[in-house]
Amino acid sequence: MPKKQDNIVNSLAHTKWNCKYHIVFAPKYRRKIFCEEKRLAIRDILRTICGWKGVEIIEGEVCPDHVHLLLSIPPKMSVSYFVGYLKGKSSLMMFQRFGNMKFAYRNREFWCKGYYVDTVGKNTTAIKEYIANQLERDKEMDQLVLFDPKDPFMGSK
């Protein structure tokens, strides 16, 4: 399979553009909800919504407690508008698909209020690799056993 160029320039009527963003957001209370069926569902929902708005998903990873996306968003659309739309619509679609979630999330608020966004310039390949390996890194961190030291004020016995 030929390697896709990282610096492809897109175009609108009178505009040439290459706008890529690394976006990270998490479910409310940072719950580890994205396992098996819900992981596949949110992946399909995010793809669908991005397709509706003409946003290209370059790379994406759904971790148990957050989502990483590398997106190419047209300049006619603000990042904050799109992320708000994406989180709002995906929330409604998740509650529609999984009715029992209403007990875990009050007021149908599925996502945390904020998100992380970073512009991606010439380092698209590095960001793609980071996102692709994010799930493995999270699993490694979950498997670490932390040393529980004794209380330093109790003395040694």
Locate the predicted segments by residue.
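Basic nucleic-acid-binding interfaces
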Residues: M1-K157
